[in-house]
A protein has these predicted regions:
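Extracytoplasmic/periplasmic terminal helices and flexible tails
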Residues: 1-164
């Protein structure tokens, strides 16, 4: 086993191996606020970033999906395949709630950032406007896992050569 290998159960993703020794490995769970998973809505194929907010162990949040996407409660969420850790199509969960990001930020200052560019002009960017906050109910019961499986990326070395 090696670091950065994906860990799944028969119901969905569990985490990523973060440390190994000769006999043991530890896993960073998807229930870690620093974990970000590339995921997509299976029906519409819209990509986003799946994160845990640190509260409810049954739900994750899918961010960065445009408000124009026709997402529905009950839609399946799967891995997006844009990483070498998890291939595309592994089950994660289902959409349980959809919230407009505009509803989550009532103070416009919380949404606006200023960026300075080369010519010393300043651009205001609204970082969350027009995006959905999607609550995803996990297929896995993360408090009751028995058997897990490890995913080894067979193309990882070849991909890393391209990056050099």
């Amino acid at each position: 086993l090696k670091t950065e290998m994906g860990v799944i159960s028969s119901d969905g993703i569990v985490g990523i191996i973060d440390n190994t020794t000769k006999r043991y490995s530890s896993i960073m769970s998807i229930l870690n606020i620093e974990m970000k998973i590339n995921a997509k809505v299976k029906r519409t194929e819209h990509f986003g970033t799946l994160e845990w907010d640190g509260f409810d162990t049954r739900h994750l949040t899918l961010n960065d999906i445009s408000e124009t996407a026709k997402i529905k409660v009950g839609d399946s969420i799967i891995t997006g395949g844009m990483s070498l850790i998890f291939p595309e199509g592994i089950n994660i969960g289902t959409v349980s709630k959809i919230i407009s990001q505009n509803e989550t930020y009532s103070d416009s200052k919380a949404r606006t950032i200023k960026i300075s560019v080369r010519d010393d002009s300043i651009i205001d960017l609204d970082i969350r406007e027009n995006y959905l906050k999607i609550e995803v109910k996990l297929h896995n019961d993360m408090s009751n896992l028995n058997n897990v499986y490890i995913i080894e990326s067979l193309n990882k070395k070849e991909f890393q050569k391209l990056k050099k």
